């Protein structure tokens, strides 16, 4: 198994929505979150914008796309907007490696941290990120831009109390 991590090209963006849709199927294991399996995903046009901005990274196995991470600048942090791995490739360390790769890219570009929002108690969400070195941030200490991300999620139907913001400091 040959794993490649690199920036996403515009030509590869068409494959990314299917990866996100597959990744969401894992939420069928949690009845109260099963709706995520059919929730709105990032469009090809949105993926093209992330890639054009240099904010999309791809994980490939034997030259076949299996995962991606898209991000945006949020102050001095690189905010992970979405990390998805095809269901078949989850649990094999590819996501961990992709986060490590993007962390190194972010460090080289001068970002001070990686940030994200995620579910507090879903095993492959906050508990996994904590094992990778991310720390959960208390709502009262959130920087304004990250607080706004949390509020935007709630405005779009996410239950505020079920989610959290996390940060990985880049040294």
Predicted segments with their positions:
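Conserved beta-strand-loop-alpha-helix junction that forms the acyl-donor binding cleft
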Residues: 116-125, 142-147
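Conserved acetyl-CoA-binding loop-helix of GNAT-fold acetyltransferases
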Residues: 85, 91-104, 131
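A short beta-loop-alpha structural element at the N-terminal edge
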Residues: 4-18
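Conserved GNAT acetyl-CoA-binding A-motif
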Residues: 106-118
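A short, internal acetyl-CoA/4′-phosphopantetheine-binding micro-motif in the GNAT/acyltransferase core
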Residues: 83-90, 118-120
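Conserved acetyl-CoA-binding loop of GNAT-fold acetyltransferases
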Residues: 130-138
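Conserved beta-strand in the GNAT
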Residues: 58, 64-72, 79-84
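Conserved GNAT-fold acetyl-CoA-binding loop/helix
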Residues: 21-46
């Amino acid at each position: 198994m040959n794993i490649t991590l690199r920036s996403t090209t515009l030509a590869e963006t068409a494959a990314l929505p299917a990866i996100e849709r597959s990744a969401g199927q894992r939420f069928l294991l949690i009845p109260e979150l099963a709706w995520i399996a059919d929730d709105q995903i990032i469009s090809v046009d949105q993926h093209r914008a992330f890639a054009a901005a240099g904010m999309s990274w791809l994980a490939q196995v034997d030259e076949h796309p299996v995962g991606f991470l898209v991000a945006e600048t949020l102050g001095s942090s690189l905010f992970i907007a979405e990390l998805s791995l095809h269901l078949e490739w989850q649990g094999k360390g590819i996501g961990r490696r992709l986060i490590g790769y993007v962390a190194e890219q972010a460090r080289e570009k001068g970002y001070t941290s990686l940030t994200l929002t995620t579910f507090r108690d879903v095993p492959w969400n906050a508990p996994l990120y904590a094992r990778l070195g991310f720390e959960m941030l208390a709502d009262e200490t959130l920087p304004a831009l990250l607080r706004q991300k949390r509020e935007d999620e709630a405005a779009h139907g996410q239950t505020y109390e079920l989610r959290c913001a996390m940060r990985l400091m880049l040294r």
